[in-house]
């Protein structure tokens, strides 16, 4: 499993020194350039090649990857060189994809600067770019390190905290310990200083991924809320943020759990509402179902759902379309 380090950014030089890279490149976006890039370059002694791409999910494409590969070639980047992804989920996804494919694999490190990336996108080795759908082209490639520092959350806009909060709620459904820790959190601003919740969320993901790196079995529980979530994102042309789509997906999964297993969906609805995340389906149920059928999570053309049986207990099964239409209609 990757080396996940909870530590201040000042520990970066010693982490990098252990890898002894030939060259170092840092991939970030134009929003983070002014916030964190200069600090990272300064920490690494200045001999760093910065690569800056536009901010946004719509730039997570094969065209962007080609531009980054071009820059790495011009920089004389080798397999023994280190690419650091500094940013949120878009950056870690595309940095991982580029590092895994350039010369069949370079050194890779992540400094996730958003809550979403810290608890989800930067953990577990999934990389990808969007192509007729979210992350349709990608690899499994574990980074050499993930440096998680809550200091990067100090500059994170509230909307991005909320974006990551949906994934934390997902872990609370999957794990009783995260659910317990969330009980005394009144609003999303408190998460900036709750390393314990971030750490526990990461631990849940790490435990699952260690059992099933390539998503052949148990890892699929991490897709809780994502079957509906990815369909919403796709239909919006990725204008709706990942977490805001997943929060609706979590409600749909909870409602399915209620119908199939008498799961108390109120526990999930309460969490989603407490953090002011969306609860209503923004598109017609039939459109959502059509988008789902194209998703990577559709197995043999069937729509496979991750369904809570109780907090900390999950079922994975294909759901009849009529039941799905009924549940989606209830949250429209």
Curated annotation (Swiss-Prot):
It catalyses: 7-phospho-2-dehydro-3-deoxy-D-arabino-heptonate = 3-dehydroquinate + phosphate. The keyword Glycoprotein does not apply. Binds 1 divalent metal cation per subunit. Can use either Co(2+) or Zn(2+). Zn(2+) binds at residues 167, 226, 242. NAD(+) binds at residues 55-60, 89-93, 113-114, 126, 134, 152-155. One of its GO terms (molecular function) is nucleotide binding. Its EC number is 4.2.3.4. It is an enzyme of class 4 (lyase). It is found in: Cytoplasm. Keywords: Amino-acid biosynthesis, Aromatic amino acid biosynthesis, Cobalt, Cytoplasm, Lyase, Metal-binding, NAD, Nucleotide-binding, Zinc. Pathway: Metabolic intermediate biosynthesis; chorismate biosynthesis; chorismate from D-erythrose 4-phosphate and phosphoenolpyruvate: step 2/7. Disulfide bonds: none annotated. Its cofactor is NAD(+); Co(2+); Zn(2+). Its main location: cytoplasm. It comes from the Archaea. GO terms for biological process: amino acid biosynthetic process; aromatic amino acid family biosynthetic process; chorismate biosynthetic process. It holds the Pfam family DHQ_synthase. GO terms for cellular component: cytoplasm. HAMAP family: DHQ_synthase. Belongs to the sugar phosphate cyclases superfamily. Dehydroquinate synthase family. This is 3-dehydroquinate synthase. It comes from Pyrococcus abyssi (strain GE5 / Orsay). The lineage of its organism: Archaea, Methanobacteriati, Methanobacteriota, Thermococci, Thermococcales.
